[in-house]
């Protein structure tokens, strides 16, 4: 197995059209210590990227 990665404080954007998936990812990532920004589509994500400067983007 690989080493555990410390995500504490990482800014993560989750892009998905499913509210259930966005919220599930948010719960998991917040528990891992991440700051989470949610977007429901690419247009929403583009509007938020400039303001939040995420370290990681999941889509």
Residue ranges and their predicted role:
Residues 1-13:
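Non-catalytic signal-transmission and effector/linker regions of two-component phosphorelay proteins
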Residues 16-17, 55:
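Acidic active-site catalytic centers that drive phospho-/nucleotidyl reactions
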Residues 18-22:
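Short acidic/polar segment at the start of the alpha1 helix of CheY-like receiver
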Residues 23-31:
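Charged docking surfaces used in two-component/phosphorelay signaling
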Residues 38-56:
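Acidic, metal-coordinating helix/loop segments flanking the phosphotransfer/catalytic sites
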Residues 59:
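Active-site T/S-Asp motif of two-component receiver
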């Amino acid at each position: 197995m690989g080493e555990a990665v410390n995500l504490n404080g990482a800014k993560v954007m989750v892009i998905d059209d499913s509210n259930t998936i966005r919220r599930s990812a948010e719960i998991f990532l917040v528990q891992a210590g991440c700051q989470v920004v949610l977007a429901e589509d690419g247009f929403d994500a583009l509007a938020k990227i400039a303001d939040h400067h995420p370290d990681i983007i999941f889509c």
